[in-house]
Amino acid sequence: MALKIRLTRGGAKKRPYYRIVVADARAPRDGRFIDKVGAYDPMKAKDDPARIVLDNEKIQSWLAKGAQPTDRVLRFLDQAGLAKRPARNNPQKAEPGEKAKERAAKRAEKAAAPAEDAAA
């Protein structure tokens, strides 16, 4: 059974409130869970200590048992010092694709052609 530490949504329409839970990865987002290990209230101010509440002991025990946090929960755990989030370094992501490079080359070629005609 693959365990995930993830968010389940609660609250009312336009008033989200999330519980941080340990659940089977195959269970629905708001479905059955094994243990509640924290809460996240995005409606509170960013500097409010009650915005993210974590039960450190429970989280450490579930991480030791092999539970994998989702990206958002891993961000919370990194801020709390419970887990280290690896740095994402993908320099190729900012590079344009092949088609975009071809279009840019054609555009530069077209821009250079009228300039040559005007000079002649």
Curated annotation (Swiss-Prot):
Q: Which domain of life is it from?
A: Bacteria
Q: Which PROSITE patterns match?
A: RIBOSOMAL_S16 (PS00732)
A Pfam match: Ribosomal_S16
Name the residue ranges with Low complexity bias. 111-120
| Any GO BP annotation | translation
Q: Which GO terms describe its molecular function?
A: structural constituent of ribosome
Sorted alphabetically, the Gene Ontology cellular component annotations on this record are: cytoplasm; small ribosomal subunit
* Record family assignment: Belongs to the bacterial ribosomal protein bS16 family.
Q: Return the HAMAP family for the record.
A: Ribosomal_bS16
User: NCBIfam families given for it?
Assistant: S16 (TIGR00002)
Query: What is the protein named?
Result: Small ribosomal subunit protein bS16
